[in-house]
């Protein structure tokens, strides 16, 4: 059963709420998960003057999430498990990075854009299984990111906690049991084990394409 954007935002905004401007984050100034350049793009499309993303309103960020993330990954047409996984991944890794991981999970060419090849197979697939695989590909990306940029290790715990929360959420939505933990940052998985479950060539190609597009929350 599909979920709504508002339902998806309940999860995503737990991780994206508030203003940040960490010099190590290539996204720069960010508020409610919306980076300044995306906000500039949105306001320009409305014929509005530029202003700091700190001033973004709920109506604005909700519309941005709808137009730039929810609609491009077609989340409203999919089972809620996959819809949530795609939406949150689009917000976290960019739409192109999200769709590449969907394409890798469906074993279709990785263009980074929605294609007929996706449409041809997605409704015949086990969408819960695809959602779980996308979560695992996110986790694997963290491994490559830290190898490429050791200074990004400061974000690793937060990334993995978010990935873990998403993995648990989609499993729960799909009727799978999840363990209760005493600590919020306990993980359900071993990062090395997940990383090594994928063919190295696949992970390297996804990362190469991510870097080629040079995206961080904006396409």
How does the language model describe each region?
Residues 1-219:
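Cell-wall polysaccharide-cleaving catalytic domain and substrate-binding groove, primarily
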């Amino acid at each position: 059963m599909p979920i709504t954007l508002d339902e998806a935002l309940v999860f995503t905004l737990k991780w994206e709420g508030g203003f940040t401007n960490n010099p190590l984050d290539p996204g720069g100034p960010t508020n409610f998960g919306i980076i300044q350049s995306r906000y500039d793009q949105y306001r320009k499309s409305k014929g509005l003057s530029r202003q700091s993303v700190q001033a973004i309103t709920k109506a604005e960020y909700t519309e941005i999430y709808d137009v730039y993330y929810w609609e491009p990954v077609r989340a409203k047409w999919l089972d809620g498990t996959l819809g949530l996984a795609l939406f949150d991944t689009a917000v976290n890794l960019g739409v192109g990075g999200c769709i590449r991981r969907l394409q890798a999970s469906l074993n279709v060419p990785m263009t980074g854009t929605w294609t007929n090849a996706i449409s041809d197979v997605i409704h015949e697939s086990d969408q819960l299984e695809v959602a779980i695989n996308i979560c695992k590909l996110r986790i694997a990306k963290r491994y490559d990111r830290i190898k490429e940029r050791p200074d990004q290790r400061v974000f690793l715990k937060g990334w993995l906690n978010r990935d873990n929360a998403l993995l648990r959420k989609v499993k729960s939505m799909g009727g799978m049991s999840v363990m209760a933990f005493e600590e919020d940052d306990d993980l359900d998985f071993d990062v090395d084990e997940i990383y090594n479950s994928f063919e190295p060539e696949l992970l390297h190609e996804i990362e190469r394409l991510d870097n080629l597009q040079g995206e961080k929350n904006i396409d």
